A protein has these predicted regions:
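N-terminal subdomain of lithium-sensitive/metallo-dependent phosphomonoesterases centered on the IMPase/IPPase/PAP
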Residues: 1-85, 144-147, 151, 178, ...
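Short basic, glycine-rich beta-strand/loop surfaces that mediate nucleic-acid
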Residues: 74-75, 104-107, 204-208
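An extended, acidic
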Residues: 139-298
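Glycine-rich phosphate-binding loop plus the immediately following alpha-helix
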Residues: 111-149
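General beta-strand structural signal in soluble alpha/beta enzymes
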Residues: 55-59, 84-86, 95-97, 116-117, ...
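DPxDG-like acidic metal-binding loop motif
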Residues: 79-90, 94-115
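A short glycine/serine-rich beta->alpha loop
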Residues: 5-8, 29, 93, 132-134, ...
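Short, acidic/small-residue loops that bind anionic groups at enzyme active sites
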Residues: 109-110, 114-120, 187, 234-238
Length: 315
């Protein structure tokens, strides 16, 4: 896929504008309006591009419009054929309650190179590229994974830090990690950002694990791929409807453990713009009469950067 700086900047512009629109609802206790504002501007800006775009990960099916729905065509239809994954507001509760962690996220890849994930849960594990890829596995015990990381990092188990969503479903895992004396970083929401904390030692996270959204797993995998990190995911289907939908999307082995190169095939671009502050990027701010945004951007192995943009306040 021919990716150039102008195209990358176009997607940075899209998530930046979506973040700004959501930012206008920060602290207003209305996550639905924040999400809708981000969706509307994201659709508007995507349709301005000379691309033949198709949503493969969005916010629902066709009958749930005006969300960016799975299968929706975007762009002029005259340019390159690309798959698009979006999460216009990752952490809607963060935005509604003016808490850290709100992001606007998009990932793109050549047509059929971005996994079309069903709207269901995924068991995930991600580690830094400096840890051997065979050190952890979804099929290993928690204890074995942690001990292997400690050995690979040449540090005591008590110095290993694990990041996981603070959910009742994770009580057993959290208890086991605590028994091992592992340092914990518990997240109330936002498992895209959580997974990306393994990309750099400055975040002091050795492993991200646990059950979160399947679509969010694919979005995170796009960025993790650029950093050479390890990621595994296995979908969890709770209802017959989940299974039926997965099969219609081409998933045959319901227990399959997906490796990173099966989720992201070839080149991909990932962009996340902060709405509220997070470990990854700063949230939207206002300086004089302008909005200032900060975006976390990756493109395969060739481009990893934090980009700042300014936009005039028009209202």
């Amino acid at each position: 896929m021919l990716i150039n700086k102008d195209l990358i900047n176009s997607f940075v512009n899209i998530t930046s504008k979506a973040a700004i629109e959501a930012f206008k609802f920060v602290g207003m206790k209305n996550k639905i309006m924040a999400d809708k504002a981000a969706v509307d501007i994201m659709r508007e800006e995507l349709n301005k591009l000379d691309i033949d775009g198709k949503i493969v990960i969005g916010e629902g099916e066709l009958d749930e419009a005006p969300m960016l729905y799975i299968g929706e065509k975007l762009g002029s239809g005259k340019g390159m054929s690309i798959d698009i994954a979006v999460d216009p507001v990752e952490g809607t509760n963060f935005v509604a309650n003016n808490l850290p962690g709100g992001l606007s996220v998009i990932a793109i890849a050549e047509r059929d190179h971005l996994f079309n994930a069903p709207e269901t849960y995924m068991d995930k594990i991600a580690i830094n590229k400096n840890i051997p890829s065979d050190a952890v596995d979804l099929d290993n015990s928690i204890r074995d994974n942690i001990l292997n990381i400690a050995e690979a990092r040449n540090k005591d188990v008590s110095k290993v830090r694990a990041c996981i969503l603070d959910r009742p479903r994770h009580k057993r895992i959290i208890d086991e990690l605590s028994d091992l004396k592992v340092k914990l970083k518990l997240l109330s929401d936002g498992d895209i950002a959580g997974a990306l904390l393994v990309t750099d030692d400055k975040y002091d996270v050795d492993i991200f694990l646990g059950i979160g959204g399947g679509p969010e797993g694919v979005l995170a995998a796009s960025a993790l791929d650029a950093f050479g990190c390890k990621f595994q995911g296995r979908f969890i289907f709770e209802t017959e409807e989940d299974i039926k939908r997965a099969k219609t999307m081409g998933i045959k082995d319901l227990n399959k453990k997906y490796e990173l190169n099966e989720i992201i095939k070839g080149e991909s671009v990932f962009c996340a713009t902060g709405i509220t502050n997070s470990d990854l990027v700063k949230g939207v701010t206002t300086v004089n009469n302008e909005f200032v945004t900060e975006s976390f951007v990756t493109y395969k192995n060739s481009f990893k950067n934090v980009i700042n943009n300014t936009y005039p306040k028009l209202d």
